[in-house]
Amino acid sequence: MIIVSYDISDDKKRANFSKMLKSNGAIRLQFSVYEVRNTKRIMDNLVAKIETYAKHFTADDSVILFDVDSDKLTKYGNAIHRDQAIVYF
């Protein structure tokens, strides 16, 4: 699994970055931390998309990718901020 952690100062850029992660199957664990299923194709695609965002980063912005063995991961608490679907009839 890949853990993506980011600190982006601009609200609009941060929101767009979050939407991009979600559209690539990322699950929000905390406000600026996402979990992504790891395959070479997904990782290559994700890195390419992050590089397009990185061109617009300021000196205060950062994105860190962690390649984590899910069998060695320990989670405490229930801090998963998944968006709930809303359905209108």
Residue positions per predicted region:
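Extended, hydrophobic alpha-helical segments
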Residues: 1-41
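Juxtamembrane helix-loop transition sites at the ends of transmembrane segments
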Residues: 28, 34, 46, 51, ...
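Short amphipathic alpha-helical patches
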Residues: 32, 40-48, 69-77
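Short, intrinsically disordered low-complexity segments
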Residues: 36-60
